[in-house]
Regions:
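Active-site capping/gating regions of soluble enzymes
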Residues: 4-186, 195
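Terminal low-complexity tails and localization/encapsulation signals of metabolic enzymes
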Residues: 159-160, 164-167, 171-298
Length: 298
């Protein structure tokens, strides 16, 4: 994420973009940093006098994020582990985008009627924004938006060769075909209309009292053992902790030699340098000669 933000700032700072409002960014609401990313985007747009488009989505790489956190033994997951919390995050992010419309043009990508209704309620009818849907999905909902609310709707249609589109289409199929997805719930005859239309802010509080089935990455192998701890090098808090531990030895030189009873006779001291920064002298080492070896054995 930090690398992406650095690239985005570098592009927005380019003076050749002066007067152009076509730059767009996607924010994924399932990320726990989503609200902070929106604040950052607004600050950068203001800094360089830009107007940018921000497309808000729920997020399409949940499985990958969860698996990576487990493999790397991170302290916690970077994304919400429950769908209802992601739905709540989406609305909070939507409200923030609407309130920052002086520098941001909000684009809400959703097929969820609950999300649409809440966004329409939050909007002041004066702030320009749009809804978005995938080609072939959410057609009825977005047609109603156009007819009743007179709000712009954009169709997101991927274009390209089969080998490039297949992976993308499979991800969309898995995302929208999940049992918990709004689109899938609509055709589930076992669910009543009231269940589908439940307020996510109420259901999330109810579900928070239930024990989650998804263990933290550190608890993945319990009760047998604790998962080996990893470090998220994209997390500034983790990097800060690593640097704090390293700073204790910042000016320390490691000088070593053979550990034998008698005095070391080898006099050649080899300077050891940091291979990543050759000017950084880590320390020195004195290698044992033949006499030192004999003394050690004796």
């Amino acid at each position: 994420l930090d690398l992406s933000l650095d690239i985005i700032e570098a592009v927005l700072s380019d003076k050749s973009l002066n007067g152009w409002d076509g730059f767009g960014v996607v924010v994924q609401a399932y990320g726990k940093r989503a609200l902070y990313v929106i604040d950052w985007l607004h600050a950068i747009a203001k800094k360089y006098n830009r107007k940018i488009m921000v497309r808000l989505v729920k997020g399409a790489y949940w499985d990958t994020e969860i698996k990576r956190a487990q493999i790397e033994g991170l302290g916690n997951f970077p994304v919400y582990t429950r769908k209802d919390l992601t739905d709540c995050s989406y609305i909070y992010c939507a409200e923030k985008l609407l309130n920052l419309s002086d520098r941001i043009y909000p684009q809400f990508a959703t097929h969820n009627a609950n999300s649409v209704a809440m966004i329409l309620e939050l909007s002041d009818k004066k702030t320009p924004f749009e809804f978005q849907r995938l080609h072939g999905m959410g057609e009825v909902l977005h047609r109603l938006i156009l007819e009743r609310e007179n709000v712009s709707c954009r169709i997101y249609a991927p274009v390209g060769p089969h080998r490039d589109l297949l992976a993308y289409l499979v991800r969309r199929l898995l995302e929208n075909g999940a049992n918990s997805s709004f689109v899938n719930q609509l055709i589930d005859t076992s669910l009543s209309a009231s269940e589908i239309a439940d307020d996510v802010f109420i259901t999330s509080k109810i579900d928070s009292n239930k024990k989650t089935k998804l263990l933290k990455p550190s608890d993945l192998f319990l009760p047998d053992r604790i998962n080996s701890r990893g470090w998220d090098l994209h997390d500034m808090n983790d990097i800060s902790e690593i640097n704090s531990s390293r700073n204790v030895f910042k000016n320390h030189e490691w000088n070593i030699g053979p550990e034998i009873i008698s005095e070391v006779t080898g006099i050649e001291k080899i300077i050891i340098r940091n291979p990543a920064n050759y000017e950084d002298i880590v320390g020195s080492v004195i290698y044992a000669n033949e006499k030192d070896t004999i003394n050690s054995i004796n």
